[in-house]
UniProtKB/Swiss-Prot annotation:
PROSITE patterns: RIBOSOMAL_L29. SUPFAM superfamilies: Ribosomal protein L29 (L29p). GO terms for molecular function: structural constituent of ribosome. It comes from the Archaea. The keyword Iron does not apply. Belongs to the universal ribosomal protein uL29 family. InterPro entries: Ribosomal_uL29 (IPR001854), Ribosomal_uL29_CS (IPR018254), Ribosomal_uL29_sf (IPR036049). GO terms for biological process: translation. The lineage of its organism: Archaea, Methanobacteriati, Methanobacteriota, Stenosarchaea group, Methanomicrobia. This is Large ribosomal subunit protein uL29. Keywords: Ribonucleoprotein, Ribosomal protein. It comes from Methanosarcina barkeri (strain Fusaro / DSM 804). The keyword Transmembrane does not apply.
Length: 67
C-alpha cells in the first residue's frame, strides 16, 4: 500500500478516507504482530510510515470536522 500525501488525502471522499484509515490500522496490527512474534519485518521503516500516514489522515479529518 502506498504512502499517501496530504494532497491525495484531501482529494479523497469521506468514505475513502475512512476505508484507508481502517486498512492502514489493520496493516499496522499485522506488522506489529510479526515483530512481536520474533520475526524480522521486510521493511523496518514501514511501521513508522504507516503511523505517520494514519496521523495525516486523522489530522485532515479533524481539520474538516469529520471526527
Amino acid at each position: 500500500m502506498a504512502i499517501l500525501r496530504s494532497r491525495e488525502i484531501r482529494d479523497m471522499s469521506l468514505e475513502e478516507r475512512a476505508d484507508e484509515l481502517e486498512n492502514l490500522n489493520s496493516e499496522l496490527v499485522r506488522e506489529r504482530a510479526l515483530t512481536s512474534a520474533g520475526g524480522a519485518p521486510e521493511n523496518p521503516g514501514r511501521i513508522g510510515e504507516i503511523r505517520r500516514t494514519i496521523a495525516r489522515i486523522k489530522t485532515i479529518q479533524h481539520e474538516l470536522n469529520e471526527i
